[in-house]
């Protein structure tokens, strides 16, 4: 989990304060961040949305976006560690370039008027995000501490998979298949109502970065998944674009919440179709 937030960065709810803060940025950065579709601005937007959903409270969780529609699709913007996600600003992102994960920009480089000398730390999720980008060519990767994600892993203690079938919301998720020719996992459509959604569950570790090996193993072993659950911790979800990742995350959380209620009432998560 991220460390407590001690920073005094600007309140993102105040548009006036945000506009005033822009004057401390270089003209180049001012131009970048004036675009509402810039990945850094989208991270801020999603962080506030996810905070309202109780997915990234208490500085927990993280979001990263690869600039797939920009001039350099290898650029990845990552929210820092230990900041209140609902108050984050676009200039507080770390910028990394794939495939070598070269650090191009940190929020510690921006004028102190914007940070009040707060020392930003890279997200502990960074190596896990990088795994999703390299292994699945993702356009965005989301990590939340959703209570639904945590609870379902508790209910499935000792199990390595979450499975659910015959639920309409499953159709919001992609159908993926490993292509032997390209050696890549490719989207071939969407899951159908009668399909079984399978999400691997990995065990938590004391430090986030120590999850990297088990996350990579799950990604290799489950080519059909767009997410990995971390027991007693949360979930990682990725998609080909930021908006697809958002949709997948929302759909999965809906299914997790429903699955918890189904378990509580004794309804099997996977429908028996043999009778």
From Swiss-Prot:
UniProt-annotated binding residues for substrate: 125
Biological processes annotated in GO: L-methionine salvage from methylthioadenosine
Pathway: Amino-acid biosynthesis; L-methionine biosynthesis via salvage pathway; L-methionine from S-methyl-5-thio-alpha-D-ribose 1-phosphate: step 2/6
Record field: transmembrane: none
Subcellular location: Cytoplasm
One Pfam family cited in the UniProt record for this chain: Aldolase_II
Protein name from the UniProt record: Methylthioribulose-1-phosphate dehydratase
Chain segments annotated as coiled-coil in the UniProt record: none
Cofactor binding note: Binds 1 zinc ion per subunit.
Gene Ontology, cellular component aspect: cytoplasm
Family according to the record: Belongs to the aldolase class II family. MtnB subfamily.
Keyword Transmembrane helix: no
Known cofactor(s): Zn(2+)
Native source organism of the sequence: Lodderomyces elongisporus (strain ATCC 11503 / CBS 2605 / JCM 1781 / NBRC 1676 / NRRL YB-4239) (Yeast)
């Amino acid at each position: 989990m991220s460390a407590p937030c001690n920073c005094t960065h600007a309140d993102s709810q105040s548009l006036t304060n945000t506009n005033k803060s822009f004057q401390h940025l270089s003209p180049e950065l001012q131009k970048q961040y004036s675009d509402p579709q810039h990945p850094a601005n989208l991270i801020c937007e999603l962080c506030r949305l996810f905070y309202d959903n109780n997915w990234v409270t208490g500085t927990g969780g993280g979001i990263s976006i690869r600039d797939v529609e920009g001039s350099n699709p290898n650029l990845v913007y990552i929210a820092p560690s230990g900041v209140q996600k609902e108050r984050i600003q676009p200039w507080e992102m770390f910028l990394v370039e794939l495939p070598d994960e070269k650090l191009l920009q940190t929020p510690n480089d921006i004028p102190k008027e914007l940070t009040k000398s707060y020392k930003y730390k890279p997200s502990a999720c960074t190596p896990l995000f990088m795994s999703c980008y390299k292994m699945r060519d993702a356009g965005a990767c989301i990590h939340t501490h959703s209570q639904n994600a945590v609870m379902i892993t508790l209910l499935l203690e000792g199990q390595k998979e979450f499975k659910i079938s015959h639920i309409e919301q499953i159709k919001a998720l992609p159908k993926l298949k490993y292509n032997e020719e390209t050696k890549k996992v490719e989207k071939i459509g969407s899951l159908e109502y009668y399909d079984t959604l399978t999400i691997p569950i990995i065990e938590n570790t004391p430090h986030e970065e120590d999850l990297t090996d088990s996350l990579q193993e799950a990604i290799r072993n489950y080519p059909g998944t767009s997410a990995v659950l971390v027991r007693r911790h949360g979930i990682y979800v990725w998609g080909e674009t930021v908006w697809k990742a958002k949709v997948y995350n929302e759909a999965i959380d809906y299914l997790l919440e429903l699955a918890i209620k189904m378990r509580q009432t004794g309804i099997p998560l996977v429908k028996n179709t043999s009778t």
